[in-house]
């Protein structure tokens, strides 16, 4: 049986969007930092398009936050 990893992308995107706004970074600046089109970045924040995991990791890195994976017990 194949394991599938799912994530609550909407909650994560809300947190990343709030962090960007708190740090007073524009969508354009953050999109440029992570190497994606500003329009696409805006679609991610509006939850019109789901970013790939790689893009989420780049987004986290640009905001200097950690992306961790755990199971329900807090272990992996």
Stretches found by the model and what they are:
Residues 21, 32, 61:
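Alpha-helical residues within the helix-turn-helix
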Residues 15, 26, 52-55:
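Residues that mark the N-terminal boundary/hinge immediately upstream of a DNA-recognition element
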